[in-house]
Amino acid sequence: MSSHTPAPALYGGSANRRVTVQDLAAAKERGERWPMLTAYDALTARIFDEAGIPVLLVGDSAAMVVFGYDSTIPVTLDDMIPLTAAVSRATKRALVVADLPFGSYQAGPEQALESAARLMKEGGAQAVKLEGGHRVIAQVEALVSAGIPVMGHIGLTPQSVNVLGGYRVQGRSEEAAEALLSDAKELERAGVFSVVLECVPARVGAEITRQLTVPTIGIGAGPDTDAQVLVWQDMAGLSPRVAKFVKSYANLAEQLRDAATSFAEEVVAGTFPDEQHSYA
């Protein structure tokens, strides 16, 4: 690309190739913000891909929104692989990032490598995400050395909810904010291509974003991060309860209830199927 040719926009850009981690880095240099959504199945992944969402996260939040658990802890690597494969098969442009679930990397670098390799070989992921700062640096370095792109995740780390004492905002005190910044810088030095900041004060999200050269992705981290992510069911108004940081852009729960009710009423009344929906 010549110096006179503008870089393609990250959101809604060309569908001729996959978004890469280099594209995300270039977007930060340009000051271009971008969206990320979760996806767990082929149909929604295809819709989001067609909508121009540049990064899709196959999140361990599947534990709650797909499998019905009350935390992310129970979901397994064997659960995550087919979900990742479905999203990868259904998309042409979005960078597909898969969460390393609880228990799949904490034992050390070797376990992390084995788990990430499965998500990439069997699931088709182009990158993986893991939670934690200083305590997972060895895992991050091993993954990056093996050629596996890694997205970091600090702040509220749901896999550690039992240690954190619940789903609470992190980094409110000066000491806690400094610890988060230290973790973020360590992750950057270890080679992550981006860092998720979850449930931290807006000022902390802004400062970490300012000090890192890699993109930050906010979820409840204020307006100044380089990107924003939401669980798609929260974004679309399907979840029954959402956090303060969630904005719902549709009321999918009500639409689905209305559709199911209309279908049921027509079946009971004998008006579906009608001639239009029957074979001659």
UniProtKB/Swiss-Prot annotation:
Organism: Thermobifida fusca (strain YX)
PANTHER family from the UniProt entry: 3-METHYL-2-OXOBUTANOATE HYDROXYMETHYLTRANSFERASE
Protein name (database record): 3-methyl-2-oxobutanoate hydroxymethyltransferase
Keyword Transferase in record: yes
Keyword Membrane carried by entry: no
Top-level EC class: transferase
Active site as annotated: E198 (proton acceptor)
Annotated residues for binding of 3-methyl-2-oxobutanoate: D60, S61, D99, K129
Major location (coarse): cytoplasm
Keywords: Cytoplasm, Magnesium, Metal-binding, Pantothenate biosynthesis, Transferase
Gene that this sequence comes from: panB
